[in-house]
C-alpha cells in the first residue's frame, strides 16, 4: 500500500468532535468528489465517488450522522488500468436532501453552486478550516513516499476552489501554490517541513511520524553518501599523487640514478619506493628524528620539478636548488 493510501486510511478514521467540523469535512469531500443527478420532476440525488473504501465509509457515516437520510454504498469494478474498485456513496432523491445542498451552497432550482469556491460559513473557525483541509485531501489529495521527492497535492477541477484552498493553507503558514494540469488545478506543497505541518493540521499523526522517520533516515543516508564520496575523492587524490610520485622517482632512477640525488631527496625517493601506499605523514615518521608532513611534501615537490626538467630535454649536471 502506498504512503498516500496509508495516510488517507488514517485520516478516514479521524472524526471531528464538533458538528461544524464534521460538516466542513463532508462539504469538502462532496465538493471534491460529488455530483448531482436530476431525474424527472426535478428530483435530485447525490453521488460521491471514491476509490478508497475507508473514505467511502467515512462519507457514509458523516451523511448518516449529520442528515440522517437514506444512504447507500455501491461498488463498481474498473475495467481499465489497475482495475481498482470504485465506491459510490449515493443519496437517492428523498425529502430532506435539499438540506445537504443548502449546507454546501447549492440551490436545486438553479442547477449550479452559488459559490464556486469554499462556502465561507463552513470555515469560520480554525477547527473547521483544518477539517475542510482534511476532507479536501481525502477527496482529491495525495502525498509522495518521503523516501523519494517531497510532494503533497490536492487536485480540483475548479480554479476558484483551488485558489481558496491555497488561501486556506496559507492561513496556516503553509506556502501552497497552484498549477494548472490539463483540465485540473493542482494545489501543492514541496518542502518536507511544510508537508509535516500539513499532516499535523489534518491530524495524520502516524503518517507524520513515518514521514519524519523516513526523512531522518534519508538525511543520514545522504550525509553518509556525501562523506563516502568525499573520502573516495580524497583517496583518489592521494592515490593519484602517489602514482605520480612513483613515476617521477622511477624516471630519475632510470635516467640518472637515485644515488646522484642529494641525501634528503635520495632517502625520500627510496622510502616512497619502499612504502608506495604510505601517507606523507607516515613517510616522515621513518626518519630519525621524524620529518614533518610539509617537509616531506617539500622534498617530493623538488623531485617532481627535477623530473620535469629532465623530461623537457635538459641535461643533469648535479642537483641545484631553484
From Swiss-Prot:
Keywords: Cell cycle, Cell division, DNA-binding. Residues 279-312 bind DNA. Transmembrane segments: none annotated. It comes from the Bacteria. GO terms for molecular function: DNA binding. SUPFAM superfamilies: Homing endonucleases. InterPro entries: Homing_endonucl, Sporu_reg_WhiA_N_dom, Sporulation_regulator_WhiA, Sporulation_regulator_WhiA_C, WhiA_LAGLIDADG_dom. Pfam families: HTH_WhiA, LAGLIDADG_WhiA, WhiA_N. GO terms for biological process: cell division; regulation of sporulation. Belongs to the WhiA family. Involved in cell division and chromosome segregation. This is Probable cell division protein WhiA. It comes from Desulforamulus reducens (strain ATCC BAA-1160 / DSM 100696 / MI-1) (Desulfotomaculum reducens). The lineage of its organism: Bacteria, Bacillati, Bacillota, Clostridia, Eubacteriales. The gene is whiA.
